[in-house]
Curated annotation (Swiss-Prot):
Annotated organism of origin: Borrelia turicatae (strain 91E135)
Lineage top rank: taxon: Bacteria
Protein name according to UniProt: Lipoprotein signal peptidase
Active site: residue positions: D124, D146
Membrane topology value: Multi-pass membrane protein
Predominant cellular place of this UniProt entry's protein: membrane
Length: 170
């Protein structure tokens, strides 16, 4: 098996596992926790599991825009971006960059699945205290797909700033 085919298979397996975990966690939240209900709290109120829906994007931005525009901004454009990221990931030779891109793809796919199949919005359920940093007492509620995207982007920025000029096979 050539390296590109092996890389494609590995990426597909990794993406499938992450998307499955994201969707499974959302399924459990939808099945067992009513919308707007806090289910568990850990370490006082530092970390909570609460079922909310997000009809916008990051931090609920755009949740009030016209529904006819939501398909364009929250489905079509993200799908085009994911196709670009996927093609970039297939060509990338650096392992760190590939992992970052696969994380971004996994998160994007997980949230796009919600947009297609959950008319009430993307399922968010992880709620973390933020101690007033940036004026936020609590970080906006998120899900595993959101985490994949943030970790992937952070990892890619670190790679781009520090490791890009190093060997391509870190």
């Amino acid at each position: 098996m050539n390296i590109n085919r092996s890389r494609l298979i590995n990426n597909f397996i990794f993406i499938s596992i992450l998307v499955f975990f994201d969707q499974w966690s959302k399924y459990l939240v939808v099945k067992y926790i009513r919308i707007g209900t806090e289910y568990l709290s850990f370490f006082g109120d530092f970390f909570k599991i609460i079922h909310v829906r997000n009809t916008g994007v990051l931090f609920s931005i755009g949740s009030n825009i016209d529904p006819s525009l939501k398909n364009l901004f929250f489905l079509i454009i993200p799908i085009i971006i994911l196709i670009f990221v996927f093609s970039f990931a297939l060509k990338e030779t650096n392992r760190i960059a590939r992992i970052a891109l696969v994380l971004i793809l996994s998160g994007g796919i997980g949230n796009i699945i919600d947009r297609f199949f959950r008319p009430l919005g993307v399922v968010d359920f992880l709620d973390v205290k933020f101690f007033g940093i940036f004026g936020l007492q609590r970080w906006p509620t998120f899900n595993f797909a959101d985490s994949y995207v943030v970790i992937g982007i952070t990892l890619f920025i670190i790679y781009d700033l520090f490791a890009k000029n190093q060997s391509t096979n870190l």
